[in-house]
Amino acid sequence: MKLLQTFILFIGFQFISAQILIVEFDVQSQKDNGKVFLRLKNDQNEIVRESIIPVENKKATIRFTDLSAGSYSVEAFHDQNNNGKLDTNPFGIPKEPYGFSNNVRGNFGPPDFELTLFQVSGMTATKIKIVLR
């Protein structure tokens, strides 16, 4: 009986110490059509999650659960014509709205990766707002 009580106590501590980290992204765009493509990257610039979600009322909400605590980055674009890619002009400049976490912009290319990093920790949901331009 004492072994069973110890086991139950151990399991209880496991649930208390386990963290279910949640990040919710509110993505705002200029138009009410197409889909938002979003990539979540870890601090090593490796893709850990991806999502494609329809835009409704010029907004898309994406929620990732069961993340590990740490630093992450997001890049997103609004595929307005539903062709599955970010359209660019002949010079490689995007013709569709795009954005990064922390709403940073780069000069003549994407921003420095370090500037897009944000922290996920604790027992509460982290909410990130990204404006696509």
PLM region descriptions:
Residues E56, S68-A69:
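Surface-exposed loops/turns
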Residues Q44-I53:
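Surface-exposed loop/edge segments in extracytoplasmic proteins
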